[in-house]
């Protein structure tokens, strides 16, 4: 199951984004304001997407990305100047102010990409040589 976790310092922002995603038919498993809480939610699902801002109460988005399993992607919502130079793998950026249309399209694109990766991993595990 692909879970979506929304992490913003401002609880109202997190709730608003959760509501937008829920109206779009996406399953949001958690809304929180710290990276530690996001890690707790991440432990409850196999893979997912973390939607977050540049800074949480206890860590930066790059630290959270390092702590997340490889099966998780991150959607960073921040002004363009806050993004790193794109060196961190697994992070998609969306510049503020965001439009609902852009948010929904980006999330759908990320979910489809994750589904393709999951199917590919499943197919590879079935085609493994039993002698390995």
Where are the predicted features?
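Two-component/phosphorelay signaling modules centered on CheY-like receiver
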Residues: 10-30
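CheY-like receiver
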Residues: 114-132
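Alpha4 helix (beta4-alpha4-beta5 surface) of REC/receiver domains from two-component response regulators
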Residues: 63, 78-96, 105
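C-terminal output helix
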Residues: 98-111
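Active-site charged/polar residues at nucleotide-handling catalytic sites that mediate phosphoryl
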Residues: 44-45
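Conserved phosphotransfer microenvironments
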Residues: 14, 35-39, 48-69, 79-82
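Conserved hydrophobic helix-helix packing surfaces used for dimerization/oligomerization
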Residues: 3-5
């Amino acid at each position: 199951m692909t879970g979506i976790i929304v992490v913003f310092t401002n609880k109202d922002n997190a709730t608003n984004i959760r509501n937008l995603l829920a109206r779009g038919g996406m399953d949001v498993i958690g809304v929180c304001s710290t990276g530690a809480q996001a890690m707790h939610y991440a432990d409850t699902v196999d893979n997912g997407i973390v939607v977050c801002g540049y800074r949480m109460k206890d860590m930066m988005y790059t630290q959270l990305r390092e702590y997340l399993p490889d099966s998780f992607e991150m959607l960073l919502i921040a002004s363009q100047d806050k993004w790193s130079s794109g060196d961190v793998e697994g992070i998609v950026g969306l510049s503020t102010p965001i439009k609902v249309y852009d948010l929904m399209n980006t999330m759908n694109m990320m979910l489809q990409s994750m589904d393709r990766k999951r199917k590919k991993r499943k197919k590879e595990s079935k085609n493994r040589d039993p002698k390995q």
